[in-house]
């Protein structure tokens, strides 16, 4: 079977991509490759200084690279709306939205909007951002939305009765739930896009096991075991960032990819941890149509962002569908807007 690599990516000149969390790791590699193939790339990052340094790094490696930055804190709906406004102002058309940013297994914390931090960052922020820039995607024939999930979704379950973990918090469960939410969102979004006959498709990906900044919350032993210096013994279980970004890049740029597909490393050494990108299987829970619809409704209520999906590629300039409607946000808790659990 042919191995899919970055050499299979066509010229992306004239296409604009937004990559969240693009200042390091998988996001930076994804942005670098897209820019190297001619795309104009917007690095949407929480820390604008780090985003600018990442942009400088990409330009230093390729003087032709067209890279800009925008501040995006996915844990803040106000920041998401500001970033979406900036993106919409700068990008009349948007070919790719890569929902890459994420956090993993953090101590319990509530955001300023009252949401559990992992769920807010990994799912709700991306749900809101996607809806708020959707008109720019719908205005672009062949546009794609790629959301990163994780093998962690396999152990994930949606606790709709306590999405904010008020009744008890376990970092691994919060992470698994958020990664399952990424897939439920992707499948429901693509279903709605298809039903509307829209020119945009939604896909998902996972990187396998890659040593990135996400692992900074893990134990020293775990960090050591997956580090590059242990490559001689962990080669079967851990891959580098360049390989880890390939499933996302394939979902974003392979002409043969279809909406609703999920890409990850091809099975190697009987695991799904490493390998070249191919279609991947997601859990039975991720295909639960009732949970997909329920999560969508809950996400609209919590974020205040209601999607408007209309049919008809391409939309004439100036006649794009209106952006997602923003309503008053319903917070997940009463009392203090932001709190930590002791």
Please report, for each region that a protein language model flagged, where it lies by residue:
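Rossmann-fold NAD(P)H-dependent dehydrogenase/reductase core
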Residues: 1-222, 301-316
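Pocket-edge positions in alpha/beta enzyme catalytic cores
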Residues: 43, 72, 236, 284-287
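Short, solvent-exposed turn/loop segments enriched in Gly/Ser/Thr/Pro and often Arg
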Residues: 265-267, 314-318
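C-terminal helical subdomain
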Residues: 178, 230-280, 287-293, 297
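Short glycine/proline- and charge-enriched loop/turn segments
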Residues: 161-169, 222-229, 274-282
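Short, intrinsically disordered C-terminal tails of secreted or membrane-associated proteins
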Residues: 336-341
């Amino acid at each position: 079977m042919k191995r899919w690599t970055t050499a299979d990516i066509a010229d992306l000149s004239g296409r604009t991509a937004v990559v969240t969390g693009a200042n390091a790791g998988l996001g930076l590699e994804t942005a670098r490759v897209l820019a190297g193939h001619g795309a104009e790339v917007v690095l949407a990052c929480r820390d604008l200084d780090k985003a600018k340094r990442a942009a400088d790094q990409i330009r230093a490696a390729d003087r032709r690279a067209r890279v800009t930055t925008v501040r995006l804190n996915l844990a803040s709906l106000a920041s998401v709306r500001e970033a979406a406004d900036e993106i919409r102002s700068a990008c009349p058309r948007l070919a790719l939205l890569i929902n890459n940013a994420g956090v993993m297994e953090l101590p319990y914390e509530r955001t300023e909007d009252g949401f559990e931090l992992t769920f807010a960052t990994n799912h709700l922020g991306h749900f809101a951002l996607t809806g708020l820039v959707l008109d720019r995607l719908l205005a672009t024939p062949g546009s794609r939305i790629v959301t990163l999930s994780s093998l962690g979704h396999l152990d994930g379950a949606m606790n709709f009765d306590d999405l904010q973990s008020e009744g008890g918090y376990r970092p691994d469960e919060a992470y698994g739930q958020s990664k399952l939410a990424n897939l439920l969102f992707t499948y429901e979004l693509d279903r709605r896009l298809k039903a509307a006959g829209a020119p945009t498709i939604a896909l998902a990906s996972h990187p396998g096991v890659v040593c990135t900044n996400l692992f900074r919350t893990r134990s020293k032993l775990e960090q050591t075991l997956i580090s590059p210096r242990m490559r001689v013994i962990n080669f079967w279980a851990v891959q580098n960032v360049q390989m880890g970004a390939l499933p996302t890049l394939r979902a974003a740029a392979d002409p043969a990819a279809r909406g609703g597909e999920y890409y990850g490393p091809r099975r190697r050494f009987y695991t799904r941890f490493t390998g070249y990108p191919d279609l991947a299987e997601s859990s039975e829970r991720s295909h639960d149509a009732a949970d997909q619809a329920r999560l969508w409704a809950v996400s609209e209520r919590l974020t205040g962002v209601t999607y408007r999906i209309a049919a008809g590629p391409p939309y004439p300039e100036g006649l794009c569908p209106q952006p997602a409607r923003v309503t008053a946000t319903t917070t997940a808790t009463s009392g203090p807007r932001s709190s930590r659990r002791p």
